[in-house]
Amino acid sequence: MQQLFGVGRGTMREALKALEVQGLIRLTTGPSGGAVIERVTFDRTFQFLQNYLFFEDITIGDMYALRTILEPEMAALAVPHLGEKEFDALERSIAMSDPREENIQPAAVQRIEDLHFHDILADACPNPLLRFQCRLINRMLETMVVSALHATQEEHRRLGEASWKAHRQILAAARDADVSQVRKLMLAHIVENQRHLDLLQSGLRRRLVLDSDLRLGGAPLPQVRPMRAPAPRTRKGA
């Protein structure tokens, strides 16, 4: 490779290391060692995107504006590619997010499973770009929604019940291979979810203001947007 590119050993070593950091290759040692091409994983790609997204003012509303467009089509495209393996995974996800008291899971588990249901469908979608976009939004929502778990528990319960019911309906339509019904149900589900999450945000804002008022004994602090990425910090003396 040094001869092929006309570079020295040090330059080649640095180039290979850069490719390894990006997840494009895996370096092995030993007599039969060398560089092996690796498939870049979704998790690694998301880590890189986080560096960009950290400086963007992205809200729940921004993400749901995309979800209402992407998710119904993603689910519809996935239907012909769902087999028993996918149906079993969807059933398990629904069971994990069951809101009935005898089967209740912690709020964090329920919210993550709500999104995992959508990831299972996305993985079956034959359109790789649509699949990636849906999974990217789900991963961002996972962080934002879990960060609001200390908002009103009543709203979390309502969100869980609505999602559980919608997921059961979507799964039933998918088993019947009813593509148009899956698309319709998914759109209704996303719209309803946004309404519940808007209430969660509102409840969290009220709670933050009330807590601050009680601690400070003065006027409430200005309303904040708790689900926005914080601004980067600078070190003193930098």
Please provide the spans of the model-predicted regions.
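Short linear motifs at protein or domain termini
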Residues: 1-70, 76, 80, 205-207, ...
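Hydrophobic alpha-helical elements and their junctions with loops/disorder across both membrane
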Residues: 22, 82-85, 200
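Short, charged helix-to-loop "capping" segments that act as catalytic/coupling loops
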Residues: 24-35, 42, 102-107, 144-159
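Short, solvent-exposed segments of well-ordered alpha helices
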Residues: 54-61, 108, 154-157
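Conserved amphipathic alpha-helical segments that form helical-bundle/coiled-coil interaction surfaces
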Residues: 63-148, 163-172, 181-195
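C-terminal all-alpha effector/ligand-binding and dimerization domain
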Residues: 140-238
